[in-house]
Amino acid sequence: MGNITESPVWEDNVLQIEVGDSVGGGPLAVANLQAQDLANRTQYLKAKADTADKNIDDLFNDMNRIYNGQDLTTKFADEIATYSDDPWAWIKARITAVDYGGLNIGDYIPFSMGGNAIKAQIAGIDTYYRANDVETGHHIDFISKDCYPTPVPWNTTNINNGNATNAAPWMVCNLKNVINTTWYNSLPAPLKAQIIEKRAYIETRYTSGSTLTDSTGAAWNDIGKLWVPSEGEVYGTVHWGTKGYSSMQNAEYPIFAASWRNRIKGIGDGGARCRWWLLSVYGGNSTYVCSVSHGGLADYYDASFATVYAPVCFRIG
């Protein structure tokens, strides 16, 4: 007697031994095939049940806001291997196929940028699907768990207005320029190959010959291949921005909803808590820009303040 080797395969049919069949012996003998079919089914159902248990645990962790996320390059290593071990080509293919099975808010893809470890977390899945003046397709927006370890002033001069080139403050600020040149150029080539521009309806604040203290309108803009979220995308409401114009289109990213867990970010991967910039500018003032404090509060700092950080944020779709 020996043991049957089980495989997690669903057998559509279970062999029926007929009168006159030669029974024989060994793993491929007729006498053993029926048991083999049933054993395979049992192993298949066990694998499915184990996966369901794990998914339920993850769901409850998410409901309790204690889900830390999983490394997708480990969780889906076998799938990624079929894309020449390129996780970015793999996630792009998943998005194109609208196959989000096993992908959860907070899960991440790790990579190196300028010699620094970055964990790009899933912040939202199809958060802006079909929105905007130009219809947005299927996408995933990623926001790094912690900030890039080099601080960047939001502006080189202490002003939060747009200018004659573009009335939207974000579009002409120093932070947008730095992250879309220096930072972007430090990204791995396979990641750059998959990033697309994020388009958004963002506030405008500019009048020739004047310095404005409130935003007076909004306009559609391609806000960059790298960007930072708005106040509304982090907090789900306006705290310091101009009422109306600063958050007309924003949806709160699920990763920030109902918890401060992911609003609080460190200086580099796992580093000390830090303050970090948002896209929105302050209402009622010509120098402040909205931010997140190192304790997670909705905050603001002078646009030229030099020791505020930013996460690495991008869209694949």
What residue ranges belong to the model's regions?
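Extracellular "spike/adhesin" assembly and maturation modules
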Residues: M1-D50
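Short, Lys/Arg-enriched charge-dense amphipathic segments
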Residues: V23-G24, D53-K54, S84
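Compositionally biased non-globular segments, especially hydrophobic aliphatic-rich helices
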Residues: A52-N55, E203
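Collagenous Gly-X-Y triple-helix signature in extracellular proteins
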Residues: N61-G317
